[in-house]
Amino acid sequence: MKIKLKQQNQDITIGVSDISEIKPLILRVMNSHHTGWSQLRQSFKCIQYGLSELIINAIEHGALGLGSDKKYRLKRNGTYEAYLNEKIRMMTHSILIECIESNTQIKVVIDDYGKGFDWKTALRIAETKQDGKGLCIAQNTFDELTFDENGSRCHAVCLKK
């Protein structure tokens, strides 16, 4: 799988073959704006966790098209991570992650080029069901969390102090 990073007028393509490579990728994105993150209300770790949830959701549900029922069945069987890593290695889709910093905010845009989802409903039911917990975490992490109409592009915004 390829992840395309757009940051500071640079386009970088990174090959990812394992879900464990996501955390270092997030650190790379965040470290490219090392001064900006320190000016935010949220902690570095909290933002890292929120971004991780959004990127993993983009991989699972957007790029791979993994449905919630199958995901939880794989988790119950203890085969989720192996399944996910196998699919990631075979995946031809890419995900775009763009980090945009201004005087007032840092915005991370994640585009999975998938079919999208009904994000308004998903955010509403996330508080009461197992489905959507990652979205609920992200919603509580960022000052603004929005999606395009079909739900395949996410905008996560952190305002500066």
Q: For the regions a protein language model found, what residue spans apply to each?
A:
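Flexible, glycine-/charge-rich segments associated with ATP-binding catalytic modules
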Residues: 1-20, 104-108, 115-116, 128, ...
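Glycine-rich/acidic phosphate-handling loop/turn and adjacent ATP-lid/helix
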Residues: 69-132
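Bergerat-fold GHKL ATPase/HATPase_c domain
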Residues: 1-52, 60-76
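Short, function-defining helix-loop hinge/capping sites that tune catalysis or transport
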Residues: 65, 119-120, 142
